[in-house]
């Protein structure tokens, strides 16, 4: 085959290929092209978002501001954790009571309705004397009621006495304890705790040494309030 014939054949092939490409574009049949998937560009996986954020990601036009006439799309990553819109143009703040306070109020309500044991549960924790008795000096005594170990700890300055609860009896708003010293078992102490509220109690202690009751005013007698951590909890001497 001579060279002029090869040249004619090549020209015919090029013309046929050009005609094919022109025909494809004319009829809309564009040859396929590899397009990388959308996820490879860092698209946010909507399955990991809250439901309201998934709705925003699926329909971003729903978040357009139609009142002002502008179209603004909310970022779904911030929409899921955004606080609720304020009512009436002002931020609404609601102070929720601490969980422990709510539980104590519930216990107090149950106790006032006569539920046995509610007052003893309500006593658990640390209490500080607010009305200093004449025998306690300038130091505010502390009482710690430990229900888990059935112990009552009496503290004042460097003095700390731990008494084990032998028995407890509740009558109306008063809990009576019979206790004994963990170090010297012959030292017993009767304790009467009367509730004025779920945060205020009145305590009367009677010493019982070797079965001899000492009826004088005890340094532990007086009014106590529940101790809350913080500089404002402890009253000034």
Swiss-Prot record:
This is Uncharacterized protein TP_0751. Residues 52-96 are annotated as: Disordered. Residues 1-28 form the signal peptide. Residues 63-75 have a biased composition (Polar residues). It comes from the Bacteria. InterPro entries: Pallilysin (IPR041037). Keywords: Signal. It comes from Treponema pallidum (strain Nichols). Pfam families: Pallilysin (PF18663). Disulfide bonds: none annotated.
């Amino acid at each position: 085959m001579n060279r002029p014939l090869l040249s004619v054949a090549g020209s015919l092939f090029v013309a046929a290929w050009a005609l094919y490409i022109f025909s494809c574009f004319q009829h809309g049949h564009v040859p396929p092209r590899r397009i990388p998937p959308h996820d490879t560009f860092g698209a946010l996986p909507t399955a990991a978002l809250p439901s309201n954020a998934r709705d925003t990601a699926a329909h971003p036009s729903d978040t357009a501001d139609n009142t002002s006439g502008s179209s603004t799309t909310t970022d779904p990553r911030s929409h899921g954790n955004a606080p609720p819109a304020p009512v009436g143009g002002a931020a609404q703040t609601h102070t929720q009571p601490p969980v422990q306070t709510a539980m104590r109020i519930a216990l107090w309500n149950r106790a006032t309705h006569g539920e046995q044991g509610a007052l003893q549960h309500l006593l658990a924790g640390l209490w500080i004397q607010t009305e200093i008795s004449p025998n306690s000096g300038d130091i505010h005594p502390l009482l710690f009621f430990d229900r888990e170990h059935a112990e009552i700890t009496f503290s004042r300055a460097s003095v700390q006495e731990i008494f084990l609860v032998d028995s407890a009896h509740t009558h109306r708003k008063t809990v009576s304890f019979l206790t004994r010293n963990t170090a010297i078992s012959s030292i017993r102490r009767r304790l009467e705790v009367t509730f004025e509220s779920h945060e205020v109690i009145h305590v009367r202690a009677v010493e019982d040494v070797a079965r001899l009751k000492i009826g004088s005013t005890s340094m532990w007698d007086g009014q106590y309030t529940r101790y809350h951590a913080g500089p404002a909890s402890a009253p000034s001497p």
